[in-house]
Amino acid sequence: MWSLTVILLISYFLGSIPGALWSSKALHGVDIRNHGSHNCGATNAFRVVGWQAGALATVVDFGKGFLAAGVVASVIRIDPIPSGLSLFGGDPFVVLGLLAGVGAVIGHMYPIFARFEGGKGVNTAAGMLFALTPLTMAITLAVFVAVLLSSRYVSLSSITAAVAFPTIVALRRFGFGADLDPSLLVFGGLLALSIVVAHRSNIQRLLNGTESQISSFEPAQGMLGRGEL
């Protein structure tokens, strides 16, 4: 049980690395929590300081989830595996990867290194799930890109992709006989729900027609580059 605790703690601290905040401060000396949406995530980094910090934040946030689920959960061995990790009839090693990934997502949303003011966890969750089921996540990312290109709303793209993931898992498992662990479907559904809840203010702005859109897919200058800070 101590090994499981260590995995969760390491994953939380890994997730707590505030990629958007630190990249924005390092490259531009700007605390993005004071500007834009005030969210400490990659999208706000793009919006406030431009593509360089935003791209770096995206890679860091994705990597946190990938490393937690794909590396931390594998390097620190648990022997024997607690029977409770076979929840939902799933492979306990897959469930362990999911728990480690969730630890990183929680760290991203409530980072100890940034006064517990984090992002919404979409990129970190994507990294976690890519480590565990890369083909499903590749399809999900294609859905994200398609919605983004057609709507120009990052929030709508994130919400759609979150709902698409468990749907794709179900279709692949039950429709095409893919050997996908059932825990992916359960966790995917719970994660989709949490991401939708985290975006409730965005949903309200989408309904009101006041949500910010991407004006151009050229490398973003951000508010800083446009002299708006």
Curated annotation (Swiss-Prot):
Pathway: Lipid metabolism; phospholipid metabolism. One of its GO terms (molecular function) is acyl-phosphate glycerol-3-phosphate acyltransferase activity. It is a multi-pass membrane protein. Its EC number is 2.3.1.275. It is an enzyme of class 2 (transferase). It is found in: Cell inner membrane. It catalyses: an acyl phosphate + sn-glycerol 3-phosphate = a 1-acyl-sn-glycero-3-phosphate + phosphate. It comes from the Bacteria. Keywords: Cell inner membrane, Cell membrane, Lipid biosynthesis, Lipid metabolism, Membrane, Phospholipid biosynthesis, Phospholipid metabolism, Transferase, Transmembrane, Transmembrane helix. InterPro entries: G3P_acylTferase_PlsY. Its main location: membrane. GO terms for biological process: phospholipid biosynthetic process. The chain crosses the membrane at residues 2-22, 56-76, 93-113, 129-149, 151-171, 178-198. The keyword Membrane applies. One of its GO terms (cellular component) is plasma membrane. Belongs to the PlsY family. Catalyzes the transfer of an acyl group from acyl-phosphate (acyl-PO(4)) to glycerol-3-phosphate (G3P) to form lysophosphatidic acid (LPA). This enzyme utilizes acyl-phosphate as fatty acyl donor, but not acyl-CoA or acyl-ACP. Probably interacts with PlsX. This is Glycerol-3-phosphate acyltransferase.
